[in-house]
């Protein structure tokens, strides 16, 4: 699963997920899966969606993952009283704003790409849409 190799500090504040996304255009592939809603995407969700897409395209074409989980989420163990410091890092997330391109794909027909992205979108906790590359 994806996570940073090393960080300056192990734990982070919760923060807020406001604003609109950078990385809002398809820049590597021909087709993309773009977020419409906002939320947090865990490393497990990124991997589950990637596997669903890879199986749908039968390992043809090329897939790019445009997001990386760089925020640690901590949890305290069950039945532990409050206090005594912040909990341990349990998993990693990336914060997603509306307009962020999550995955890109090329080398497959549009119908296959749409189907693959639909399977991937079902694994994610927010709404997404299918986009194509615009040539200027």
Curated annotation (Swiss-Prot):
GO molecular-function terms, A-Z: rRNA binding; structural constituent of ribosome; tRNA binding
Keyword set, alphabetical order: Ribonucleoprotein, Ribosomal protein, RNA-binding, rRNA-binding, tRNA-binding
Entry keyword annotation includes tRNA-binding: yes
Alphabetized CDD domains for the sequence: Ribosomal_L16_L10e
Gene Ontology biological-process entries: translation
Pfam families: Ribosomal_L16 (PF00252)
GO cellular component: cytosolic large ribosomal subunit
Gene3D superfamilies reported for this sequence: Ribosomal protein L10e/L16 (3.90.1170.10)
PROSITE patterns in the record: RIBOSOMAL_L16_1
Entry keyword annotation includes Cell division: no
Entries under InterPro entries matching the protein: Ribosomal_uL16, Ribosomal_uL16_bact-type, Ribosomal_uL16_CS, Ribosomal_uL16_dom, Ribosomal_uL16_sf
Coiled-coil positions: none
Family: Belongs to the universal ribosomal protein uL16 family.
Described function: Binds 23S rRNA and is also seen to make contacts with the A and possibly P site tRNAs.
Subunit organization: Part of the 50S ribosomal subunit.
Name used for this protein in its record: Large ribosomal subunit protein uL16
Source species: Pseudoalteromonas atlantica (strain T6c / ATCC BAA-1087)
């Amino acid at each position: 699963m994806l996570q940073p190799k090393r960080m300056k500090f192990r734990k982070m504040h919760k923060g807020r997920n406001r604003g609109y996304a950078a990385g809002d255009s398809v820049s590597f592939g021909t087709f993309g899966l773009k977020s419409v809603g906002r939320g947090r995407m865990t490393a497990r969700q990124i991997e589950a969606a990637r596997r669903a897409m890879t199986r749908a395209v039968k390992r043809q074409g090329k897939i790019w993952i445009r997001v990386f989980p760089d925020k640690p989420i901590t949890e305290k163990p069950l039945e532990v009283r409050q206090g005594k410091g912040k909990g341990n890092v349990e998993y990693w997330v990336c914060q997603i704003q509306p307009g962020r391109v999550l995955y890109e794909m090329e080398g497959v027909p549009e119908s296959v790409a749409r189907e693959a992205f639909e399977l991937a979108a079902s694994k994610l906790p927010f709404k997404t849409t299918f986009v194509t590359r615009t040539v200027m």
